[in-house]
Curated annotation (Swiss-Prot):
Gene: svr
Native source species: Drosophila melanogaster
Binding site for Zn(2+) 1: H101, E104, H217
Residue span(s) of domain Peptidase M14: 39-335, 455-760, 863-1121
Pfam families: CarboxypepD_reg, Peptidase_M14
Disulfide bonds listed in the record: C156-C309, C236-C237, C268-C308
Record-given protein name: Carboxypeptidase D
Tissue: Expressed in the central nervous system (CNS) of adults and larvae. In the adult brain, increased levels of expression in the mushroom body (MB) and neurosecretory cells.
pH-activity note: Optimum pH is between 7-8 for the active carboxypeptidase-like domain 1, and 5-6.5 for domain 2.
Length: 1406
């Protein structure tokens, strides 16, 4: 029996062994034939495979259609379960999703393998069968089929611009989900533009009671768990933990511990303890899918990074399957940990949406499904659990111990009793209706719901009107003042918006400004009427409701209330009340891009208020409502030369012949102006007003500069400085029409006013954020390479108005990689598109490779160098690059105070043919430390560029000599302040170099610096400032203005620095302007001061950022030498005329030729120019030259011919016209070629024909009779000059008649030297005579007034009395022979010694 029993036992063991897949001596072979010929399945192959599996396993497999991608590809999920037709009660649904980023493909193929493996092996492997039978599994191999189609196999990193990572719109889907930290209005706005792939997944996730999920990515090897972001929005390295952190860590470890590589945590140059990480600790992102699952559903989701390479070769897929198979299966089993159960009512019916709470984890209750099911994942432990539901009593807490030892979760059911209800009292539904239907009222009151009075409102009436309407609609309006007028009146603005009070991300800001000219009142009254119209129609007019809900509107009704108060009703074209109380036209008072004059030199309070208001809000579109004409006017309002030509500012009834000045957005501006004009019943006709019959405006629109020049205008300032597109709308020919006419104006302008507001939505808009979802403020958004930029706001939202069609969009954020993409604005209503932009963090080394010849020192570990370190670095650069660099240190008085580095090609060769540039770290000692770090970076850039033979650098050094001055004098004082407080920002010294240069006191540094400028005669100078990002330069010269624009035009325009004002910053700004003007006026040196930072001495880590933001502007400055004109000036014998000079016509600056070969060279922007070449005693020459960009035009040798003066020679100018008179024009100069102003030029014998020279020595005399005439020039302190001319042609002016006056060296007919000599002798003789006479008079008076004046013998005294040696007392020792009659009390004595006798006299005075 024992033997038989042993036999049966052995047989039983053998039988059992047959059912175990991995027992010793027996293994069930798995079906993994799908690993043969590994490849990535295409979309078509994937769909066919899923269809085949569904057909092969009709009960266990089912394909679900989730939605379509942006390009129409199917999003599919394969369900694998015991019975796909009907899920068994309490079977937990689990999902695996992959290929969210289209170029991260390993997970996509692993889920394909997973489907084949589960279905092919669940019947032969019992554990696998148990898993499939007890779990409802959903596999989504690709969430982003469009991105996958764009990706390329073998690329371990994303393609340029992250093509393939995002969907077809290049949107990162893992930033597109609703976020738990979003405000409700942001959530609603983002929902409007959610990508179809995201929307499909969101709907699917919330529609099923998923318990567990995994999202498979690539690019690292780690298991990441929520949360992915935090309230602090740190970039990284700070954990953001869920209430279920212990569960998530267990889930992550389940995957990692079963992965042979992941569990080590050190793959891909990363370091993750145990192969897991909290998402926010790794890097933060908002809008991620795993956070959405946990926050908005019951699902616990992990993000699994599978491989270092995002899209590895297909041959690696079998190896990846073997690494991840166990982890995939074990994670599925985690759906069965914790507790599960049903929540039902007393009758056993399921309660949907009941909440199941675990004590200590109340922040995350589990909601029941429609069938009353719940699952609560928990780690082992003792828990107290209860359930609650609306309308039911909360259950009693139940204590439960979780061990997770079983194959299924511990079951815990709840039955809830209904809440007892006892409603006392009578209730009735109150329905509130208007007394009259809105449609009837609108028809009765012409679109309004209440009667409307068309009348004028003075300031008091307007203020009362606005207060009343604001109090009537408090939920839609906000009344606020932006400042006060000169006379103290408030500048009232009414905000109209669904939720007024603050900027709402994603909602555009719009403004209307009226009554800028106090006597132009139509805009003001129409805005008051428009306000009433919109508020009354809100809620019963779909158009108005949509406008108010989606647009934040601001109406400034009167910008000039003081002017309005003195205006006169009925004024059609007058000027009373046009200006403010200071008599200033406010539309001439804004800062102008081309210059400053008396109209905008001092900012008026109304203008300052409007500027501050405009800059405080992200206005997208604006209109300035005027009167006096009927036209829509768009920028620019003036040209670059209009500050020098007052005649261009006159409205002379004709726009023919005026030069337009379009912006880069000219087509867009014309479209906006056309929208307003075409909506007006007559504006589009372009007919003139009665008083200006020659003003015709095609299509009712005009460019401002082409109409008439307005310098200091508001619409140009809005475009250039505030980034807001603004039009000026002239609303009618009459400025202050009668009140009875206002109803007609309202009928004409109502539709244009509304249509113009609606244009704020046209174009491109969205949000700019980082890869972790952090909003990026100040990001630059540009279209089609234009220089005009839009900037994202605090929440990352941006608006870029654009016409329908394809555009190239460029986005740049500080410390983020640039992003370029092509977008298409639809050509159907509403002509807008949402484009959210994700920027990747920038790599400094990558930037250095692309922009700075890979000079890592310029961007990594930046610091402030001490004076010895700076000198050592400059000396080292000279030693290593002697052919292009020369270090000046203690080689002269200048080099002792200012160490400098001189750079040019072939040091030591003649430099007459080269431009001279000066780059100074700063003229402020407190800014110099930052400036000289930028200067050192620039030197390294040029040196490295020359080593690499970069074309631009080599050409620069061939054409120029550049002096670099890193100021060192007070560095240690400033550096000590910084070391004591690294956040000092703006150190302050009492005596800056710039102030010393402007001051009258003698200073060694100042003197040697100014002497250096005089001796070297630089062409241009660049220096660095702080406190702003502006570029300061001499105003008024169009060439210098073009240079400034060229410097500021960079590929990527960073957001202008918004630096808070301070007293020292304002002082530096004013000092810089004075210094710039002084340098230009006295030393003929244009100085450009580039603002590079808010702080004068920011933290040294920020030096790299300052360098990166400004390198392009600095390079643009140096590139100015590439364009210009040059030549040699010689006489007719080929000899150089070293006293010659060159003047650019219509410009003040004069360029002297070089002292050796008489060469001149001018840096000029491209364009057509006129040059006047002049030399003493030689006829001037006028030369027309067309300067091409990037090329120095060589004029060769310019031959000058001597003057023919009036010494019996007559200069004939052949003409053929028979007119009786002509005109003569020219210039009067002194011998040094300086203009002589106020010189009298006249025709001898014709007393009425005379004129005086202007500031540049120019003159013109008209109506000069034909024939032989004599011109005479007279000027104070100069000898007069005459010239005889023979004029025989009338009508055509005789130009370029140049006089050179000699200084009158005679005074009173004597040569100046002889006069000075004679005058000096006469003065000396006169002085001597006066002294002698005074002395004689003094002695006479002294003698006459002293009666005791007398002579006496010297008293004879011994040594006792005189206190002298024995010899002094005489040999005989006598004491006194005679007593002197002089009074003894007189003590002062004067000895008079007669040289011809031996007598001594004593004159004693009282």
């Amino acid at each position: 029996m024992p033997t038989l029993g042993l036999l049966f036992a052995s047989i039983g063991i053998a039988v059992l062994a047959m059912g175990v897949p991995h027992c010793r001596g027996y293994t069930i072979k798995e079906d993994e034939s799908f690993l043969q010929q590994p490849h990535y399945a295409s979309q078509e192959q994937l769909e066919d495979l899923f269809a085949g599996l569904e057909k092969a396993y009709p009960n266990q497999a089912k394909v679900h259609f989730l939605g379509r991608s942006l390009e129409g590809r199917n999003l599919l999920a394969l369900q694998i379960s015991r019975n796909t037709r009907s899920r068994n009660l309490l079977t937990p649904p689990v999902k695996y999703i992959a290929n969210m980023h289209g170029d991260e493909t390993v997970g996509r193929q692993l889920l394909v393998y997973m489907a084949q493996y589960l279905l092919g092996n669940h019947e032969r492997i019992s554990d696998l069968g148990q898993l499939v039978n007890s779990t409802d599994i959903y596999l989504v191999p690709t969430m982003n089929p469009d991105g996958y189609a764009l990706s390329q196999e073998g690329n371990c990193e994303s393609l340029p611009n992250y093509v393939g990572r995002g969907n077809a719109a290049n949107i990162d889907l893992n930033r597109d989900f609703p976020d738990r930290l979003e405000q409700s209005h942001v959530h609603q706005l983002r929902a409007q533009s959610r990508q179809p792939e995201t929307a499909a997944l969101v709907n699917w996730i919330v529609s099923k009671p998923f318990v567990l999920s995994a999202n498979f990515h690539g690019g690292a090897v780690v298991a990441s768990y929520p949360y992915d972001n935090s309230l602090a929005h740190n970039e990284c390295c700070e954990e953001s933990l869920t209430p279920d952190d212990r569960v998530f860590k267990q889930l992550a470890h389940t995957y990692s511990d079963n992965h042979p590589i992941m569990r080590k945590g050190n793959n891909c140059n990363d370091s993750f303890s145990g192969g897991i990480t909290n998402g926010a600790h790794w890097y933060e992102l908002s809008g991620g899918m795993q956070d959405f699952n946990y926050a908005f559903s019951n699902c616990f989701e992990l993000t699994i990074e599978l491989s270092c390479c995002k899209y590895p070769a297909a041959s690696t897929l079998p190896q990846e399957w073997q690494r991840n198979k166990a982890s995939l299966l074990q994670l599925l089993r985690q759906a069965h940990i914790g507790i599960k159960g049903l929540v039902t009512d007393a009758s056993g019916f399921p309660i949907a949406d009941a909440n199941v709470y675990v004590a200590g984890l109340e922040e995350k209750p589990m909601r029941t499904s429609k069938r009353g099911e719940y699952w609560r994942l928990l780690t082992p432990g003792l828990y107290s659990v209860h359930a609650s539901a609306f309308g039911y009593q909360t259950s009693a807490p139940q204590q439960v111990r979780v061990t997770n030892d079983n194959q299924e979760a511990l079951r815990l059911d709840f039955k809830l009793a209904p809440v007892e209800t006892n409603f006392d009292g009578n209730f009735r539904k109150v329905k509130v209706e208007r007394s009259e239907p809105p449609q009837k009222l609108k028809k009765q009151f012409n679109g309004f719901l209440t009667p409307t009075k068309y009348e004028h409102h003075n300031f008091t009436a307007m203020e009362s009107y606005l207060r009343a309407i604001s109090s009537s609609y408090p939920s839609l309006t906000r009344l606020y003042s932006i400042g006060k007028s000169v006379q103290g009146r408030d500048l009232w603005v009414l905000e109209i918006f669904a939720t007024p009070g603050s900027h709402v991300p994603g909602v555009p800001e719009f403004k209307y400004v009226a009554n800028m000219h106090g006597n132009e009142v139509v805009g003001k009254e129409l805005l008051l009427i428009l306000t009433k119209y919109m508020l009354e129609r809100y809620g019963n007019d779909d158009r108005i409701t949509k406008l108010v809900n989606g647009t934040r509107m601001h109406f400034l009704y009167s910008m000039n209330p003081d002017g309005y108060e003195i205006s006169i009703e009925g004024d059609r074209t007058g000027g009373v009340g046009r200006a403010n109380a200071h008599g200033i036209d406010l539309n001439r008072n804004f800062p102008d891009q081309y210059g400053t004059d008396r109209f905008n030199k001092v900012t008026e309070p109304e203008v300052a208020a409007v500027m501050n208001w405009t800059l405080s809000l992200p206005f997208v579109l604006s209109a300035n409502l005027h009167g006096g004409s009927l036209v829509a006017n768009y920028p620019f309002d003036d040209n670059e030369n209009d500050f020098n030509d007052p005649f261009m500012r006159l409205r002379n009834s004709s726009i023919n012949g005026r030069k337009p000045n379009p912006t880069e957005d000219n087509a867009l501006f014309k479209h906006l102006a056309g929208i307003y004009s075409n909506a007006h019943p007559t504006m589009y006709l372009g007919q003139p007003c009665e008083l200006f019959q020659n003003e015709f405006f095609p299509d009712g629109i005009t460019n401002g500069a082409q109409w008439y020049s307005v310098t200091g205008g508001m619409q140009d300032w809005n475009y250039v400085r505030a980034g807001c597109l603004e039009l000026t709308i002239e609303m009618g020919c009459d400025k202050f029409p009668k009140a009875a006419e206002l109803s007609r104006y309202w009928e004409d302008h109502r539709e244009p006013l509304l249509q113009f507001i609606e244009q704020v939505h046209c174009g491109i808009h969205g949000f700019v954020h980082s890869t972790i979802g952090t909003p990026i403020a100040g990001a630059v958004v540009r279209l089609d390479g234009a220089n005009h930029s839009t900037y994202s706001q605090v929440f990352g939202d941006y608006w870029k108005l654009a016409l329908p069609g394809r555009h190239n969009l460029t986005v740049l954020g500080d410390n983020y990689a640039p992003l370029r993409m092509e977008v298409e604005v639809p050509d159907v209503h509403p002509f807008e598109m949402r484009m959210d932009i994700t920027l990747m963090p920038d790599d400094p080394q990558h930037w250095a490779s692309a922009n700075d010849f890979r000079i890592i020192e310029n961007v990594v570990n930046t610091r402030y160098h001490t004076n010895p370190q700076v000198r050592a670095r400059l000396a080292e650069l000279e030693n290593q690059n002697g052919q292009i660099a020369s270090f000046g240190y203690a080689d002269s008085e200048f080099g002792t105070i200012f160490n400098y580095l001189k750079m040019t090609s072939d040091i030591g060769e003649p430099e007459e043919h080269k431009y001279k540039l000066l780059v100074v770290s700063s003229l402020y000692d407190t800014t110099a430390p930052l400036g000289r770090e930028i200067l050192l970076n620039l030197i390294r850039h040029l040196v490295e560029g020359f080593k690499l033979q970069d074309t631009s650098v080599v050409e620069l050094l061939k054409r120029s000599v550049i002096y670099f001055l890193p100021q060192t004098s007070k560095f240690q004082n400033v550096f000590d302040m910084y070391n004591s407080n690294t956040s000092i920002c703006d150190p302050v010294l009492g005596d800056e170099l710039a102030e010393r240069i402007l001051g009258p006191e003698t200073d060694q540094a100042k003197d040697v610096f100014l002497q250096f400028l005089r001796s070297e005669r630089f062409d241009l100078m660049l220096t660095f400032g702080a406190g702003n990002s502006d570029l300061n330069y001499p105003k008024g010269d169009s060439v210098l203005v073009k240079f400034a624009h060229r410097m500021q035009r960079t590929e990527f325009n960073y957001s202008p620095l918004q630096c808070p004002p301070s007293a020292t910053r304002q002082l530096h700004r004013e000092t810089t302007e004075r210094l710039t003007n002084m340098m230009y006026r006295i030393y003929n040196l244009p100085v450009y001061t580039l603002g590079i930072s808010c702080c004068r001495m920011p933290h040294q880590k920020k030096i790299a950022s300052v360098w990166r933001k400004n390198i392009d502007k600095i390079k643009n400055f140096l590139a100015l030498v590439k364009t210009g004109v040059s030549g040699l000036v010689q006489n007719d014998k080929g000899q150089p005329l070293r006293e010659a000079y060159v003047r650019l016509l219509e410009h003040d600056r004069i360029i002297n030729v070089t002292k050796n070969v008489a060469r001149f060279q001018l840096m000029l922007p491209h364009g057509l120019y006129g040059l006047e070449v002049t030399a003493p005693n030689y006829e001037s020459q006028m030369i027309k030259v067309d300067v091409e960009d990037g090329r120095v035009t060589e004029l060769g040798i310019i031959r000058m011919h001597p003057f023919t003066l009036i010494r019996g020679v007559v200069l004939e100018l052949p003409n053929n016209d028979n007119r009786a008179t002509t005109s003569i024009a020219g210039v009067v100069l002194d011998e040094s070629n300086h203009p002589v102003r106020n010189a009298k030029v006249s025709v001898v014998g014709q007393t009425q024909l005379r004129n005086f020279t202007g500031s540049m020595g120019q003159y013109r005399i008209s109506a000069v009779p034909l024939g032989t005439i004599t011109l005479k020039v007279e000027a104070p302190r100069h000898l007069e000059a005459t010239r005889q001319m023979h004029l025989i042609q009338g009508g055509l002016a005789t130009e370029n008649v140049v006089f050179h006056l000699k200084v009158n060296e005679h005074v009173f007919g004597l040569p100046r030297f002889l006069f000075i000599l004679c005058a000096s002798v006469l003065i000396i003789v006169g002085v001597i005579v006066c002294v002698l006479c005074a002395q004689f008079w003094f002695y006479r008076r002294h003698r006459g007034d002293k009666p005791y004046y007398n002579f006496s013998l010297l008293p004879q005294r011994g040594k006792e009395q005189f206190g002298l040696e024995d010899d002094d007392g005489g040999d005989d020792g006598e004491t006194e022979l005679f007593r002197s009659p002089i009074k003894r009390e007189l003590s002062q004595r004067a000895h008079l010694v007669n040289n011809q006798t031996n007598y001594s006299f004593i004159i004693q005075a009282a």
